[in-house]
Amino acid sequence: MRQNIHSVKAKNIKIGTRDSELALWQAHTVAKQLNDLGHETEIIAVKSQGDILLDKPLYELGITGIFTKTLDIAMINGQIDIAVHSMKDVPTALPTGMMQAAVLKRANEKDIMVYNNNLDFLDAEGTIATGSLRRQAMWLSKYPNHRVVDLRGNVNTRLQKLKDNDWHGAIFAAAGLERLGFINNGNVIKSPSFVGAGKALDWMIPSPAQGAMVIHAMQRDEYSKNAVAELNDLETDICTYIERQFLKTLEGGCTAPIGALAAFADDKISFKGILLSIDGKQKIEVDKIVPIQEWKKLGYNLAQEILNNGGIELMSTIKNSLKK
């Protein structure tokens, strides 16, 4: 049973975050919301392994929680009280004693392609940059004649790399660009390092929980978890739960080519999910609308549908490919 926050001794809530511009934006957003509710906060930034190890694709590093582990350790050691994450980066299993304390209202869940000149390359041969296996697989499934190159780093770094190379475009999470104020008038991308255009990829099924921010706290920390609970958005909480349950059932971790999107539709929930081979040549999809009361096992049930439709073999192939 959750204690009344006024019955627990107040404290300055130490907010842990990665030190990238986007992560700091997220942490300051949480701090402001907590401040508005009367809580005192302090932001503590750390550098994650994922921000340091930039010379290899994420899937080759083989590190679970590469963007979250440093903050997990800081929280367990009492250096921070809560941690703010992009939810799509969070492993489906949390460390012992840690809990998901709140999910903030979801922003734009879509992917967007940022490009330099024009879109003529879409009908010819092209080179697209992304560090995501899901984006790579979905792009190659739609554009099999294209080449995909690896792209790592924070948002500004990736935009700079796009400017410096002869790639035709690069794929980003739209929410990140919007949060940093880099999208103007719908499709103009403008940052300190890049000016170009963007095209929303409405056909691309996003990463589970893309566009959502999550806050973790220790289960024993009554004050912090109760304070943060006031920020929870129930609709986003339910939708991301379904998507991550789908991911966990497929055993995809954060790097396999898996997409999932749940959304409320009146008194129903719509769900789209996909599992692809790394080269995009194979894919298994589900697309369902179900009564809202079925949400608790929806992700599991639809993942089982994919597994029973060739997904077991495809997941085995993917895992073997990633081991090479």
Question: What is each of the regions a protein language model found here?
Answer:
Residues 55-82:
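Short, structured active-site "lid" loops
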